[in-house]
Amino acid sequence: MIGYKTLRKINKRLKAVKKEKAGRQLSPVRRIERVYPVKNRRICAMTFDDGPSAAMPSPQVNNSDLGLTETLMRILKAHNAKGTFDIIGTTAENYPDKRGKLHTASWGGMKHDHYPDFEMDHLAGAVNQPQLIQKIMQSGHALTNHGYHHILYGPINYVYRQRETYHNIYEVVEDLYTLHQTVKNALAIDMKFARPPHYIDRIKDGFDAYDAYALMGYQYLAASFDGGGWQPTTGHYDEDVEAMVRPLEKALLENPEALNGQIIFQKDGCNMSLQTPIVDALPKQLALLAKYGYEVVTVDELVNLSPFEDFGEGMLYFEAARALDRAGFIIGYKNNTFQPNRLLTMGELITMATPKTIYTAKCEAILKGDRKGKASKKAFGIHIDHHIHYARQEGYLGRMGTIDPEAKVTLEMMIDFVSAISKVKGNIEVTVLEPTGETYTRAEALPILEQLLV
């Protein structure tokens, strides 16, 4: 059997290939695992998966009757830190099932996950623990969507090959929507980020997590640093705790800026051996971060300050990019880069003037869709054709005929595009800056689009 370390190495290589490919496509959904460091600050975020949990920590904390999630919140408060809790709805409906083997990835169940443990589902999830999601928000933390049932979006070999999965995008969106509405009805908030169970993106019918998140209006919540606490025990609890602390300590010793702008993965649950080393490791991790001058904030705050991985404060036209992003336009690549010096194509110019709402408007159609037939990737998937159609429908293309999405944008093309949008919006005045070269870079388009759209 292939070991976890080998699988993680393979996965790391695959992620690098996928990330490079994702850097070629502008997308309403960006995979956010880190951001460009905020100027004059050391700042990072921590996410806590699979709760909220009222189960007691294991081993239990002395002189405390708090469940796991409240224990984590107490620790965060003591260190003036804010967390992002990546919550589930409930796994209580994931039966019939059989208990999995302890110390393995199937510890909670053979067909499905069960949190906090098999036949103890009532102790975790927003549905079963509504008071906990309320306390999370009241304490200044954030909530993100980890799936109502925490069922895999699609199959994966090796570790989860016996798991049952969703079959199509209808089921995935329904699952996300159900948890979204559960939280909205309870707290009057709209979650903005989601993370697929076990990071499995592909859905059996050809769609993927990005398509589903576009329909929901989410960004893809990833992570760039593993806080640990999920692997099987070494047989010694204290060693399990130190195994969570050492990598972070090593990273900061080698480079005090190593965690700046990063998102750290944590568990709001037990490891594969039904223990919670997070309880004793988290205070040490937070103390280390404080020693090096870090602020630990919610993912919402981190991304609001610095939306992209390669483009940030102090760079020419960054403020315009942030304004357009906050206004909901599709301006970043799928891998969360902006690539300011890349030459701008006509397809990208059109996309950057397209709001993400063209996808969320289709969510109701998916929820009410005929489940007997396969959903159309052309109709509901992320594609530049939707952006061109939107631009034409809005009158943004004026009298332009056939569009070549790969054509580099010249001054003449920019003037035609700006003139058409200006006319649609009531002849607003726009200063069109000339490109420094023969055609525009992506950054050079930003102040022009900001004048038009924000």
Model feature map: region roles:
Residues 90, 150, 227, 303, ...:
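Conserved beta-strand edge residues that scaffold enzyme active sites
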Residues 94-96, 151-157, 229-231, 359-363, ...:
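Short acidic/His/Gly/Ser-rich catalytic and metal-binding motifs that mark active-site loops
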Residues 123-131, 135, 148-265, 269-290, ...:
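Catalytic domains of cell-wall/extracellular-matrix polysaccharide-remodeling enzymes
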Residues 3-196, 288, 303-307, 312-314:
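Active-site beta->alpha N-cap acidic-glycine motif
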Residues 53, 77-81, 137-138, 177, ...:
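Sec-exported extracytoplasmic/periplasmic mature domains
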Residues 42, 54-55, 59-70, 123-127, ...:
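Soluble non-cytosolic domains of exported or imported proteins
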Residues 305-454:
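N-terminal propeptides
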Residues 69-73, 84-85, 129-133, 173-176, ...:
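Extracytoplasmic/secreted envelope proteins and their assembly/folding machinery
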